[in-house]
Amino acid sequence: MRAALEQAGATVDEVTHINAHATSTPVGDIAEYKALLAVFGERVHDIPVSATKAATGHLLGGTGALEAIFTILAVKNRLAPPTINLTEKDPEIPLSVGGEAQPLGDAPQLAISNSFGFGGHNSVVAIRSYDS
């Protein structure tokens, strides 16, 4: 995440939305949360987070591309997509994950999309609004 932001010429303070990879597994989700906490600090609790894989299922190698499309649309429409089927939040992961779409406001947008694949393939893209 740090490398993606650095390559984008951005800082953690500019991020307005996170599309988490969110595997919905106890090990995977807590690991991603700890990574987010390490990068964003306590500010991560104020950033709207989506987990769009819940809407599509796991598409193996295609998952990251589709999650990036969700993130592009979130930035374009200034609206973080909902995390569907979320009925019970993990108390160990106190993120701002919504079951409803979350408005992102009128300010320039910068979102990241995490994709953590099988075998340790990890990628993150930073997507900035055109008005930035």
Regions found by a protein language model. Give the residues of each.
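Conserved "HGTGT" condensation-loop signature of ketosynthase/thiolase-family condensing enzymes
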Residues: 1-132
